[in-house]
Amino acid sequence: MIQERTILNVADNSGARFAMCIKVLGGSKRRYANIGDVIKVTVKEAIPKAKVKKGDVLQAVIVRTKKGIRRIDGSIIRFDNNACVLLNDTNMQPLGTRIFGPVTRELRYANFVRIISLAPEVL
């Protein structure tokens, strides 16, 4: 579960290393976000000469959480870290051209098929 001020790893090659959630999108009183939800983030640390720089405010989709996600068959998939993929604000496509680490199948149901196709492993 991701809430405001949560620090996330960035799982793409857009140049950002860490991002902080500043708003959970989808309703005025919504507090928490899970895998597949879109959030508003600010870049906290970035590499030099990258597509994004520190302080940029972007949208991101959550791809991994420590809390995990429960499947219909009863299994729970948990990860070691909280991670997101930065999105282009206009067309909701990923900013980077590569995705690092595994992602879950639930992103397909949230219409992020491009992230699924770029990911090295889909659980």
UniProtKB/Swiss-Prot annotation:
Coiled coil: none
Statement: the UniProt record of this protein carries the keyword Ribosomal protein: yes
Key words, A-Z: Ribonucleoprotein, Ribosomal protein, RNA-binding, rRNA-binding
Example of a GO MF term: structural constituent of ribosome
Taxonomic superkingdom: Bacteria
Subunit (UniProt): Part of the 50S ribosomal subunit. Forms a cluster with proteins L3 and L19. In the 70S ribosome, L14 and L19 interact and together make contacts with the 16S rRNA in bridges B5 and B8.
GO biological process: translation
UniProt function note: Binds to 23S rRNA. Forms part of two intersubunit bridges in the 70S ribosome.
Gene3D superfamilies to which the protein is assigned, alphabetical: Ribosomal protein L14
KW RNA-binding (keyword) present: yes
Gene designation: rplN
Official protein name in the record: Large ribosomal subunit protein uL14
Cross-referenced InterPro entries: Ribosomal_uL14, Ribosomal_uL14_bac-type, Ribosomal_uL14_CS, Ribosomal_uL14_sf
Pfam families referenced in this protein's UniProt entry, alphabetically: Ribosomal_L14
SMART domains per record: Ribosomal_L14
Any one GO CC term of the record: cytosolic large ribosomal subunit
Family note: Belongs to the universal ribosomal protein uL14 family.
